[in-house]
């Protein structure tokens, strides 16, 4: 699949994760909503589903892994920053085929697109400190 299709999958996945965080609807409902309400013709739908289901199934573990690198409790994070961090943490931990620099850069770009003015700096700082936990060999 083309990198642009993966980028679009990440973008849609962050929005879905954000929606879940605020609504607490089931991930299957969120998936269905996003797949029916968005043009997915140029989206890697399988990757979108993997990201949403992966974060949904492992968010507690991902949060625990991220917490040592945060400057405040996880429940005090901006919801979009949390969604971006969870997605990036999942990619870093589970998708070793994705180079860590790509996962971090994509997260920074998502934070720039959806977050507050300085969100991308915060996301970059957290992931830069956390990368060795998720990718000890920095592949």
From Swiss-Prot:
Pfam families in the cross-refs: NusB
CDD domains in the cross-refs: Terminator_NusB
Alphabetized InterPro entries for the sequence: NusB-like_sf, NusB_fam, NusB_RsmB_TIM44
Name of this protein: Transcription antitermination protein NusB
Role noted for this protein: Involved in transcription antitermination. Required for transcription of ribosomal RNA (rRNA) genes. Binds specifically to the boxA antiterminator sequence of the ribosomal RNA (rrn) operons.
Family: Belongs to the NusB family.
Cellular component aspect of the GO annotation: cytosol
Molecular-function annotations in GO: RNA binding
GO terms classed as biological process: DNA-templated transcription termination; transcription antitermination
Disulfide bonding pattern of the chain: none
Highest taxon of the lineage: Bacteria
UniProt KW keywords: RNA-binding, Transcription, Transcription antitermination, Transcription regulation
């Amino acid at each position: 699949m083309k990198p642009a299709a993966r980028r679009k999958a990440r973008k849609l996945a962050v929005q879905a994760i954000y929606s879940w965080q605020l609504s607490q609807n089931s991930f299957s409902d969120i998936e269905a909503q996003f797949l029916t309400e968005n043009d997915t013709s140029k989206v890697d739908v399988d990757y979108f589903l993997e990201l949403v289901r992966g974060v949904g199934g492992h968010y507690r573990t991902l949060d625990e892994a991220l917490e040592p690198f945060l400057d405040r409790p996880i429940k005090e994070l901006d919801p979009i920053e949390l969604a971006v961090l969870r997605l990036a943490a999942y990619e870093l931990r589970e998708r070793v085929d994705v180079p860590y620099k790509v996962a971090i850069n994509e997260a920074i770009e998502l934070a720039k697109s959806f977050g507050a003015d300085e969100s991308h700096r915060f996301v970059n700082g957290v992931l830069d400190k956390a990368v060795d936990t998720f990718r000890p060999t920095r592949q």
